[in-house]
A protein has these predicted regions:
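Bacterial Sec-dependent N-terminal signal peptides
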Residues: 1-25
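Cysteine-nucleophile amide-bond enzymes
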Residues: 19-209
Length: 209
């Protein structure tokens, strides 16, 4: 079963819950303490899209999307793989400003996680992610396919490429109506949320590997 067939099933299954949750989410501005950011930090967000509702319904955590950050002369940028974000957007690996990544119509809350590594490793992970910008979004959620990427797969592969498994082997096994996949979801690459400070107004880095 293709990605969008699966999404339509989940939408039907969770429609009432998703709509109620979405209505309850107030539009707030999420701020990031950019002075404390490092290259290679992972930024998680809970989004407002239907796809985000699907992910949080299937996952054990409260975040639906993730990207890897890089500081440039134009400010902080995020490399991330995202589907169907705007009506005219292609479903690809994107490279955009952090302000766009956390703008209120996309983001309910955000959290930044730091991967413990040296500058050489971080540089290698970022280089890998940058090389994938423009490549297609993985609509089949096939972790064995290195020509397409979904968000958690991209950041996982970026660090795996330089020798760090940020998932520590954790996976979600999804088997619903012919959609039978082993996937990496946001909670698989995130520390236990009870050990982290969460806020819908700001995000501060936490070291976990």
């Amino acid at each position: 079963m293709r990605y969008w067939q699966f999404v339509l099933f989940i939408i039907t299954m969770f429609l009432s819950t998703s709509c109620n949750k979405k209505c309850e989410n107030k539009v707030v501005t999420v701020s990031i303490d950019t002075l404390s950011l490092h290259d290679g930090d992972l930024i998680f967000r809970e989004g407002r899209s239907t796809e985000s509702q699907v992910v949080t319904s299937l996952d054990s955590g409260s975040y639906s999307h993730v990207g890897i950050m890089l500081h440039t002369k134009d400010g902080w940028r995020v490399i991330h793989a995202v589907p169907n974000e705007t009506e005219n957007d292609l479903d690809t690996v994107k490279y955009e400003s952090i302000s766009s990544f956390i703008q209120p119509d996309k983001c309910i809350k955000a959290k930044v996680i730091r991967v413990s590594s040296n500058k050489k490793i971080t540089k290698g992970a970022i280089k890998y992610a940058l090389q994938k910008v423009g490549m297609p979004f993985d609509k089949d959620f096939d972790i064995t396919d290195t020509t397409t990427f979904y968000c958690t797969e991209l950041v996982w592969r970026a660090y795996k490429h330089v020798g760090i498994d940020i998932s520590k082997g954790r996976r979600h096994h999804i088997n619903l109506l012919g959609f039978n996949k082993t996937c990496i979801l946001p909670s698989d690459i995130m520390p236990n949320e009870t050990n982290c400070t969460l806020s819908n107004k700001s995000a501060h880095p936490k070291t976990y590997i």
